[in-house]
Every structure is written in structure tokens, then in C-alpha cells.
Curated annotation (Swiss-Prot):
CDD domains: MECDP_synthase. Coiled coil: none annotated. 4-CDP-2-C-methyl-D-erythritol 2-phosphate binds at residues 8-10, 34-35, 56-58, 61-65, 100-106, 132-135, 139, 142. A divalent metal cation binds at D8, H10, H42. The gene is ispF. It comes from Pseudomonas paraeruginosa (strain DSM 24068 / PA7) (Pseudomonas aeruginosa (strain PA7)). This is 2-C-methyl-D-erythritol 2,4-cyclodiphosphate synthase. Its EC number is 4.6.1.12.
Amino acid sequence: MRIGHGYDVHRFGEGDYITLGGVRIPHKHGLVAHSDGDVLLHALSDALLGAAALGDIGKHFPDTDPRFKGADSRALLRHVVAIVAEKGWKVGNVDATIVAQAPKMAPHIETMRGLIAEDLGVALDQVNVKATTTERLGFTGREEGIAVHAVALLMAR
């Protein structure tokens, strides 16, 4: 078994929605990113790659590569799962914490879990997503952006 940790941050910018866990959520701002800015899936991808000792998403999908401009992070996550599987690993479970003052995540968590489970090829009970605020402290509390921490457990295939 192997454990990996992922962390990602994106700042708010222009737009009227964000994409988290594959779910489009209306919001007064968008997230600034080279891809679709899905900070949740980026952190999960990093956790999976880290557990398999395969670097991070920047190594596999550099933001300097125009092929990944506006990329669908669900497709990137599925590619990460394939890379990890090629090295002999399968997902045991994943757990993520979204750190954001706004928008409210609770109405979207179950949909996120379902999409992530689908992309990972695992059962719903192998995926956990939760959200918290920082009580208006720091950059997330000032609503300047969103951060996500994620952990992944990999098991030998």
C-alpha cells in the first residue's frame, strides 16, 4: 500500500462559475487556470501520482503546453488513473477537503463524489469529499481563491 498527498490552489478571476469535482457551480467569480481550473481534481491527481512516486500533474500536464489549455480535468484524472494502473496500482480510497469561504459546497458534494468515483473506477464509498471554511481568515477566507487537500491510498493490483 502507498499513501499520497495532493494540494492545489487557484485564485478567483473573471467568470460566473467554477468547476469542482467535475461539477459546474454558479459563482460570482471563475478560477484562473491553464486548464478548466478544477482544483479538487488537480489535488486528487497529485495525491495519486504522489502515492505512485510519479511526480505531479505539472510534470505530466505542464501549463506551458498548449495542448492542455482549457483541458477537462476529468480527462486528466482518468489519464492519471491509467498511468498509476500501468505501474501496478489501483485506488483503495481517496479523501479530499475543499477549503473555501464561498460558494457553498454542500449541495454539490454527492455529485462530485459520484463523478470522481466514476473517473477513478471505484465504488462511491471509496471516495470522500468534504468542505470547510477558514472562518474568513487567510486568502480563502477573503474569498481570493480556493484550496484543496487530498489524500489517496493505492493498493497493489
